[in-house]
Amino acid sequence: MKSVYEIYAEFLLGRVRFHLREETDVFHASLASFIDAKYVASASLSAALYERIFTTRLICESANPPGFVPSQDNLAVQLQNLRDREDEVINRNRLGFRAITKQLAEAGVLTSAEKQEYDTFYTDVRNPVAHGLTSRLYERFSGRVPDHPFEVDSAYESVYRSVAHTLIDKIYFLMGVRGFRKE
């Protein structure tokens, strides 16, 4: 796992690229929060971004019909296709994370092993962060059950430091190393 400072340097050099400027800004805010020792904020931003990356990739991957050739002449059609697909995925079908990764696997973007890995990470890390389940994170990142109810609260900062670093590293791998962004 790379240090957050190394990942930040890679990001500043333009080696970590996202589909949307909003995603880029969220990752930057997550990195800045981590560096400012605001680990809960960093983890929360990264957890939301982790899910968003897959949603955006599915929308970009499947917005245009088979055989459609994007060009300068059909930009308005491309934009409408993206809007329609986003509405379908988010509002009409309300696809959850596993349904999104399933469609990405069916499209050949993910292997079944990658789908399983990302789904497991979502369950083990993203969900507890999003729902404030610090005790579950404590057990996972400390490797043990707390001895008393106050132990989790007294150690939350170190837990969230580890969680935020893990999420940032996972996002860095997806967008910087693996190149999950659709070109």
Per-region residue spans from a language model:
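Residue-level detector of well-ordered alpha-helical segments, enriched
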Residues: 38-45, 96, 117-121, 125
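Charge-enriched, short contiguous segments at helix-coil
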Residues: 105-183
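"Short basic amphipathic alpha-helical interaction patches in structured regions
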Residues: 45-46, 64, 142
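Flexible secondary-structure boundary motifs
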Residues: 61-116, 136
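Charged alpha-helical initiation segments
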Residues: 1-40, 65
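Short, hydrophobic, well-ordered secondary-structure elements
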Residues: 27-31, 35-59
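Alpha-helix N-cap/helix-start motif at coil-to-helix transitions, marked by capping-box chemistry
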Residues: 17-21, 91, 120-123
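Generic structural signal for hydrophobic core residues of well-folded globular domains
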Residues: 46, 53, 57, 61, ...
